[in-house]
Amino acid sequence: MDELLSYSDIISIHVPGVPNGESLINIKELNLLKSECFVINLSRGGVVNERDLFNFLVLNQNIQFALDVFENEPYSGDLLNFKNITFTPHIGTYTKESKNLMEMEAVKNLINYINS
């Protein structure tokens, strides 16, 4: 992963949550990024350590981030002060199909509870 981080111009992160609440991207990994890298996190909150990201961006204003997920949502932390971060809502489940499936699953669970 070190090589990927140090050579890539654009990095898009799509991983499941990290076990034990450990972050995948911490200050060590952030310091490997190219000076004008663009990083997109579309995976899970906590994959990028937000405190380390804040400390890193104070000194590295050329690196761009796009964040779709956060450790705590809705996000209201200090990262909002950076102009080199784009924030988007995590709306991956807001398609008609996925909402319909979630609603059907909720109804099934309710029926199973009532019948048990």
Language model: regions and residue ranges:
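C-terminal helix-to-coil terminal segments
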Residues: N72-S116
